[in-house]
Amino acid sequence: MSGTFNDIRRRKKEEGSPTAGITERHENKSLSSIDKREQTLKPQLESCCPLATPFERRLQTLAVAWHTSSFVLFSIFTLFAISTPALWVLAIPYMIYFFFDRSPATGEVVNRYSLRFRSLPIWKWYCDYFPISLIKTVNLKPTFTLSKNKRVNEKNYKIRLWPTKYSINLKSNSTIDYRNQECTGPTYLFGYHPHGIGALGAFGAFATEGCNYSKIFPGIPISLMTLVTQFHIPLYRDYLLALGISSVSRKNALRTLSKNQSICIVVGGARESLLSSTNGTQLILNKRKGFIKLAIQTGNINLVPVFAFGEVDCYNVLSTKKDSVLGKMQLWFKENFGFTIPIFYARGLFNYDFGLLPFRAPINVVVGRPIYVEKKITNPPDDVVNHFHDLYIAELKRLYYENREKYGVPDAELKIVG
């Protein structure tokens, strides 16, 4: 970890803070003792967030801190509610509901999806932190065609704080009940690459309206899929469902698609998170054919590759060898718990040197061309699966190489390693 506190390249991407340039060395050798003492302190101060940080940037940092720690906070609150007799009148009925409700695994996310919740200001702050941008390369045919009086209506609000120079801009979107709309087009299965640490871009682009998803792809309601273990935390699972996030199990994915709700799957999974590196992009894709089978078993669906430039720049990941003790522990954890824990670091809440908050690295989520799967086949043969898998990889590579120079990685190669 000797490079932990010396990652100057990373720190230059941070904040654009007023402290930039604070470590410039004075060439004048006749410095006074006071100047020398100040110069000694400057490298230490560089890592701290300045008090002059704009209020809006503080809100962005808090939004990201909430997202990265929300599952822990919900867990703590649940334990507090269970251990507090005064709250049992609420905790007991909820826990009964929690044990019997199967919404995350039965496609019921369609009924729990809330555009109003996805449009809360916190998600705009979250996306502006990096920032995250959602870019479409072609227009996608809407699954639902909305009449003008059914379109998303946006209202803007401004709340003045004290002192008056601070204010919070709020946006509120009207809700749309797609269940009462006529389906006029295909559904979509978006494959998101690369996984990175936490798929931060996928959350901002497809689980919230922070990137204006409903305006960029109108009439295509979407559910981001994640590990079923995330729904084992009380309250947190309802929070995820309100954002349209659901379990990535095959049964749930098929049921969600059958209800004309498109889905987004982070294809590389837990194993790919171990490959996160700023030196290039490595994907786990050759053996990932389950999502292709889902599309064929659904029919009238488009496979759409999505590449997020900058996803792997949000954290520094310490590489481990497969034969090392740590590498074996990571693989064991993945095999037994369904996910793994990469060794990573970035910045903290009040400093830029070390912590678990991601860096402010731009994430450009570029959506490729759709690959239409017309015919529904309940048990697709291998040659059909391989055919669409090859088409998908070809489109993903085209998407990457046509856009890599535009988004700052002109020489980085795309490697499919597993």
Curated annotation (Swiss-Prot):
UniProt record similarity statement: Belongs to the diacylglycerol acyltransferase family.
Keyword Acyltransferase applies: yes
Residues bearing attached sugar chains per UniProt: N173, N260, N279
Residue ranges, Cytoplasmic side: 1-71, 208-215, 311-418
Residues with PTM Phosphoserine: S17
UniProt topological domain (Lumenal) ranges: 93-186, 237-289
GO molecular function terms attached to this record: 2-acylglycerol O-acyltransferase activity; diacylglycerol O-acyltransferase activity
Protein name per the record: Diacylglycerol O-acyltransferase 1
Segments crossing the lipid bilayer: 72-92, 187-207, 216-236, 290-310
Enzyme class label: transferase
Subcellular location: Lipid droplet; Endoplasmic reticulum membrane
Source taxon at top rank: Eukaryota
Pfam family membership, one: DAGAT
Record's bilayer topology term: Multi-pass membrane protein
InterPro entries (alphabetical): DAGAT
Substrates-to-products reaction catalysed: an acyl-CoA + a 1,2-diacyl-sn-glycerol = a triacyl-sn-glycerol + CoA; a 2-acylglycerol + an acyl-CoA = a 1,2-diacylglycerol + CoA; 2-(9Z-octadecenoyl)-glycerol + (9Z)-octadecenoyl-CoA = 1,2-di-(9Z-octadecenoyl)-glycerol + CoA
Any one biological process term the GO annotation gives: lipid storage
PANTHER family given in the database record: ACYLTRANSFERASE (PTHR12317:SF0), DIACYLGLYCEROL O-ACYLTRANSFERASE (PTHR12317)
Keywords: Acyltransferase, Endoplasmic reticulum, Glycerol metabolism, Glycoprotein, Lipid biosynthesis, Lipid droplet, Lipid metabolism, Membrane, Phosphoprotein, Transferase, Transmembrane, Transmembrane helix
EC number: 2.3.1.20, 2.3.1.22
Stretch list, region Disordered: 1-30
Cellular component per GO, a single term: membrane
Gene field: DGA1
